[in-house]
Amino acid sequence: MKERLKKLKILFLTNNQITNPLYLWLRKKAYIYKFTKPLNKTILQKINPDIVISYNYRYIIKKEFLKKYYFINLHISYLPFNRGAHPNIWSFIENTKKGVTIHLIDEGIDTGDILVQKRVVLDKNDSFKSTYKKLHFHIQMLFKQNFKKLINKKIKPKKQPKNGTFHLSKELPSIDYNKPIYKVLKEINANRKT
């Protein structure tokens, strides 16, 4: 396995500093290339990655790339709930299951087959800022625990259930990320009634 890891090439797609602990961990395991811009054919051909990891990456990946390379996404929701933007917050607003999911990437947004997922207990007395950090901690731990299986494609993907939810950034009301969640939810509900 060590020989395989030395030769393993990973393309790490991200747009957020919260992903750095996982990126640094991966640097010890394989050749890793961090990329923050829209993915293009040139970078894929140059690196020719064994696996492409999308983690807090804001750009849509072209269908033609998905056919040729192995893409996975790390998403901080318990799919199929809260696909898209701000899954942490929507899980409280809509009172859906909370957790983290690693899934294959397909043409949709967070709709690919599920590889692994984990429920996470979050408290309404915490803030959205602290629960966001907690979910990122859990997604990174889930990835590390399943790293060898993920890179060797030893996990059988399962189709996502048809139900679920999807949200865009513009749908989110203005909120204070540092307030206790229960207070923010009261404010959101009060604003919806007016």
Residue ranges and their predicted role:
Residues 1-194:
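One-carbon transfer enzymes
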